[in-house]
Amino acid sequence: MMELETGQCTIMELKKENVKELAQVFKTVAFKDTGTWHASEAGMKITVDDGSYQLASVFINPAFFSSFKVREEIVSMKISIKSISEFLSISENSSSSVKVSYPGMFQPVKMLVEDADGWVARGNFTTTLADQELDFEFDDAGVLATYLLKTQVLKEIIKDFDDTSRTVRIQFTKNSLCFTTFGDVGETTVSIPSRSLQMESVKCLEEVEFSYLLSLIQRMTTAFILATKLILRVDERGVLSCQFSIDHGEGNASYIEFLTVPADEEE
């Protein structure tokens, strides 16, 4: 039987009372098998990238957990984010809790999920040294347009995108945010006016348009479903930043950011 080490023999020890919330957060970025897990006294960060076009990061504050102990300045490891997401999703019961234990470098991360009825699941996840992460060099000083909006309308727009379209073109203007697909049924455009109740603020220094692979935008579907607000930005190179805020109640929130490079129209 696997037991979880506790105390000074571990460098990271976490507990979350509602495992479903943690499972949902991991699921938002589990589009590739492995990713990097960072932890410090400031919180936890999970980063996943596809090696070329997209990088996603989850930021979780210590207050999200019922217990959060990190005994080194920074803990970093490469680990299977997808396997952890699947393991945490075993229990859909909000009364289930999870304990996490990590002894240190090259040791496995151990997880113990328990519910009020005594049901228990144990997970053991291999770790290796963290890889160097992609850096899209997103420059805040080079941002051309910023939109703060509620996610409800975008959930519906993304759900209705034409799957036969290779790309989605996004037009960033002062008056609206426009999405256009080019599929078997032809060209389809949906716009969110700046005066819409879904749009809280708009800052557009220059009106531009860029195209992105539809498959990359669809990777954000879970984040769109869970989040209540989104800050959408684009820089002068067309790198798209989507920053999602997930409200967990009682003042607790987690944040997800997707950075996506524009598609090469000549491909």
Curated annotation (Swiss-Prot):
Identify one Gene Ontology CC term for this UniProt entry.
Answer: checkpoint clamp complex
Q: Which SUPFAM superfamilies match?
A: DNA clamp
Q: Report if keyword Nucleus is assigned.
A: yes
Could you tell me the superkingdom of the organism this chain comes from?
Answer: Eukaryota
Keyword annotations from UniProtKB, A to Z: DNA damage, DNA repair, Exonuclease, Hydrolase, Nuclease, Nucleus
Instruction: Show the coiled coil region(s).
Output: none
Location of the protein in the cell: Nucleus
Query: Has UniProt tagged this entry with the keyword Nucleus?
Result: yes
Documented EC number(s): 3.1.11.2
Q: Name one GO biological process term.
A: telomere maintenance via telomerase
Question: Which transformation does this protein catalyse, written as a reaction?
Answer: Exonucleolytic cleavage in the 3'- to 5'-direction to yield nucleoside 5'-phosphates
GO MF terms held by the record: damaged DNA binding; double-stranded DNA 3'-5' DNA exonuclease activity
Chief place where the protein resides: nucleus
* Deleted gene: phenotype: RNAi-mediated knockdown disrupts hus-1 localization to the nucleus.
User: What does the subunit section of this Swiss-Prot or TrEMBL entry state?
Assistant: Probable component of the toroidal 9-1-1 (RAD9-RAD1-HUS1) complex, composed of hpr-9, mrt-2 and hus-1. Interacts with hus-1. Might associate with hpr-9.
Family to which this protein belongs: Belongs to the Rad1 family.
What this protein is reported to do is described as:
May be a component of the 9-1-1 cell-cycle checkpoint response complex that plays a major role in DNA repair. Promotes DNA double strand break-induced cell cycle arrest and apoptosis, thereby playing a role in genome stability. Also required for telomere length maintenance and germline immortality. May possess 3'->5' double stranded DNA exonuclease activity.
Q: Under what name is this protein listed?
A: Cell cycle checkpoint protein RAD1 homolog mrt-2
> Species name for this entry?
Caenorhabditis elegans
